[in-house]
Amino acid sequence: MITRRHLLAVAAPAAVVAGCGGGGERADPAERRRGSDIGFLNSAISLERATIAAYRVGEPLLRPAARRRARQIVEQEQEHLRALVEGVRKLRGEPATPKTAEEYRRGFPRLRDQHDVLRFTADLERLQLRKYGDGLPDLFRPDLRQLAASILAVEAEHLSVLLGIAGRPQTPEAFVTGTS
């Protein structure tokens, strides 16, 4: 089971980054909005990078069919990452700094088999669903809301794929909530 410690190791850097860039009390409203959007994007970037790292760490433990699906998911996560980084740069911000592979590995739970990998990556996909779902209304720019909504839909698909590989119902809920 994924512990709070493991999720915090993945999510804490994203939360710190999200708190940055908001500007001071005297910043004009447009600058505060820009800073808020950059903070959200950088938090999402950190979470996407952690998710990609989790799939890569777990890949050797997956059976061939699951490994193929995981690689497809990683390709899509990398596309999300590129779009988010582009969004930060378009706002004249600095994208969040990535961790090393070893830093990610140290923050992850011990993965012993395919079951552990599927459970951990599904937890990360749920975390992403919450991130994008909760952050969507707070984004100021329409193009960023559209990007977040698009990524949200794909993350729901990823979760469905992982649940299917694990032999669980792929649509366990009528609504995507990011919780289990």
Where are these regions (language model features)?
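All-alpha RGS (Regulator of G-protein Signaling) helical domain and cognate RGS-like helical scaffolds
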Residues: 2, 9-13, 21-180
